[in-house]
Amino acid sequence: MTVQEYRQTRFTPPKGATEILLVRHGESRAARADAPFPLVDGQGDPELAPQGRVQAEQVGQRLQRLPISAVYVTKLQRTTETAAPLCRAIGRQPNQNPDLHEVHLGDWEGGVLRIKAHENHPIYLQMQA
């Protein structure tokens, strides 16, 4: 008996449609209890770690061949740093959009979430359940 296979095909947007590609920022620097991240509008704003800069270069190289008409970033430096290699490669400036932002972590901003996760804090474990 032959089993039918259903192969995945690449989605092609219809003519006139806008295709949106979301890119997560590169790895940011490690959190430390004695050196909390600076805050921008109440959100932790660490810079990219060395590995994050490598990731940003790699994503820039990969995406530079696509027909990109605009690049949008948040106020946070890690998003601007991640977009920089791509923007250089395609000759565009990133558009900072104040309506784009991450989930606000309240008291767990500034790297505290990472520390609580490492400590297996009960609230963090409950969030993961």
Each language-model region and where it sits:
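Active-site-proximal alpha-helix that buttresses catalytic centers in soluble enzyme cores
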Residues: 2-21, 27-96
